[in-house]
């Protein structure tokens, strides 16, 4: 069952997003201990794990998340999400259609990326629990990212659909969260702000403070 508070501090990570001196297991566990509210396994890039290696890692990270009662979301990979019985799946505009995914994930969390009004207009939100809006700011984590849309886009979507849970993504760090919260976002999703943080506990707690007031 989806709860929009899951979106508060939503950590996204894959093996290519962690510093060379740390493992993804270490980074994720530090983030879980600090209190992230949702985790998305996003294994992308030239060095991304595939096949059984990806499956084994997904199961290990899922087990870690469940030890801390944090839902485990899979990015894009429908077959992987089904195989490990993930808590949910997040897809982009170019991925499998949400309606088809909903047939397999009737009791799971479904997220959809939307970057502008055009994508919003053509998106089927019937089966979607939340939308990921962005990139809000310029981001180094996604080389194929759209042009930044700013916090204003969140306010626009909230005005159009006040009940739709929204998580902001793209270039977010502890110093630029305030405008996103003011725009009405239910949470923030980050990659490098946590994965490359020198003090993950401090970073996560600063993010949490914006949604605990």
Curated annotation (Swiss-Prot):
GO terms for cellular component: cytoplasm. Binds 1 Mg(2+) ion per subunit. 2-[(2R,5Z)-2-carboxy-4-methylthiazol-5(2H)-ylidene]ethyl phosphate binds at residues 139-141, 171, 191-192. It comes from the Bacteria. This is Thiamine-phosphate synthase. Its cofactor is Mg(2+). Its EC number is 2.5.1.3. GO terms for molecular function: magnesium ion binding; thiamine-phosphate diphosphorylase activity. GO terms for biological process: thiamine biosynthetic process; thiamine diphosphate biosynthetic process. Belongs to the thiamine-phosphate synthase family. CDD domains: TMP_TenI.
């Amino acid at each position: 069952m989806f709860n929009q508070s899951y979106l508060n501090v939503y950590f996204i990570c894959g093996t290519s997003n962690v510093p060379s001196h740390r493992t993804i297991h270490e980074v994720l566990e530090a983030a879980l201990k600090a209190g992230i509210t949702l985790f998305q396994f996003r294994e992308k890039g030239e060095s991304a794990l595939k096949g059984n290696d990806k499956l084994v890692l997904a199961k290990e990270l899922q087990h870690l998340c469940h030890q801390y009662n944090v839902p485990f979301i899979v990015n894009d990979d429908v077959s992987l999400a089904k195989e490990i019985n993930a808590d949910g799946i997040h897809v982009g505009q170019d991925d499998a259609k949400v309606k088809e995914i909903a047939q397999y994930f009737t009791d799971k969390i479904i997220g959809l990326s939307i970057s502008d009004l055009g994508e919003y207009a053509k998106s089927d939100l019937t089966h979607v629990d939340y939308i990921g809006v962005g990139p809000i700011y310029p981001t180094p984590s996604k080389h194929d990212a759209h042009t930044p849309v700013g916090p204003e886009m969140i306010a626009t979507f909230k005005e159009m659909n006040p009940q739709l849970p929204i998580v902001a993504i793209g270039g977010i760090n502890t110093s630029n969260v305030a405008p996103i919260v003011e725009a009405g976002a239910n949470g923030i999703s980050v990659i490098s702000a946590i994965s490359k943080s020198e003090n993950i506990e401090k970073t996560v707690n600063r993010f949490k403070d914006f949604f605990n007031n």
